[in-house]
Amino acid sequence: YVIGATNKPWSLDWPFLRRFQKRIYVSLPTLEARENLFNLYTAPLKKDIRVKTNELAKLFEGYSASDIKDVCQAGQLKVVHELFDSPEYREPVEGRAPLQPKSLTMADFRLIKTQRTPSVSMEMIRAYYKWSEEFKAL
């Protein structure tokens, strides 16, 4: 068996495409899937107890799984940069506990949302749907 994946299925020529017996359209993650993705990607991060993954899932509607991973990585980078840029930061010294980044907050995620738009536009979603209908993707 051969499995292929593409972000632009409409760019594939018909002789190549017809060799695939099944075509599967994978849509953007649902609310539940986004919540699961935020649970997965924020689990290792230090976050404020008021950060709720169900709220993040609602906030980031229209974002792909890859976008959500990028958002979580951006959050971690944000608090690390803030630590390094703070006047209290000093190079670690043996015998002293190093300073730790602050906990990620909902405000941090809201700020990241203003800086990162979804990678998939409504125009692209319409094109995927049209292709899916035309080629009877599952």
Model segments located where?
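Conserved AAA+ ATPase "sensor/coupling" helix adjacent to the nucleotide-binding pocket
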Residues: 35-47, 55, 59, 74-82
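Eukaryote-biased feature marking scaffold/signaling PDZ-domain proteins and nuclear chromatin regulators
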Residues: 7, 21, 29-33, 48-51, ...
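C-terminal engagement/docking regions of AAA+ P-loop ATPases
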Residues: 1-3, 10, 57-72, 80-138
